[in-house]
Design a protein with these regions (language model features):
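Protein kinase-like catalytic core scaffold
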Residues: 1-5
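Active-site "cap" helix and flanking loop/linker of ATP-utilizing ligase/carboxylase catalytic domains
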Residues: 7-59
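Short, low-complexity, polar/charged sequence segments that are solvent-exposed and flexible
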Residues: 22-26, 69-72, 76-80, 99-102
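Glycine-rich active-site loop/lid that clamps phosphate-bearing ligands
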Residues: 43-46, 52-88
Length: 104
């Protein structure tokens, strides 16, 4: 068994639990710290999470970064979460998009 990363906290690889699971990874951490039983981990939706990298701010061949057209990128149906970072850089995680595909 090989590990490439250990995170003793909620992690960005599980952010889809906020919208798609009965109990989010954030609530699970609070429950553990409070000595409560673990919550239901059942997925309510089939879900896809896509990372948003700083590359997107530089994608139109303009000089310098520009704010992406979020409405065009999300189509109004994806859940957009930006992390509030001030400076986009190529390869930097700036946020994520969650798509709830269908209810289970």
């Amino acid at each position: 068994l090989l590990f490439n990363e250990m995170a003793p906290r909620p992690h960005n690889s599980g952010h889809q639990t906020i919208n798609a699971s009965v109990t989010s990874q954030f609530e699970q951490q609070v429950r553990i710290c409070a000595g409560l039983p673990i919550g239901d981990t059942t997925l309510k939706y089939d879900v896809r999470l896509e990372n948003i990298l700083g590359d997107l701010w530089f994608s139109n061949n303009s000089i310098g970064p520009h704010e992406p057209n979020w409405e065009e990128l999300t189509g109004g149906v994806k859940i957009l979460k930006l992390y509030g970072k001030n400076e986009p850089r190529v390869g930097r995680k700036m946020g994520h998009l969650i798509t709830l595909i269908r209810e289970r």
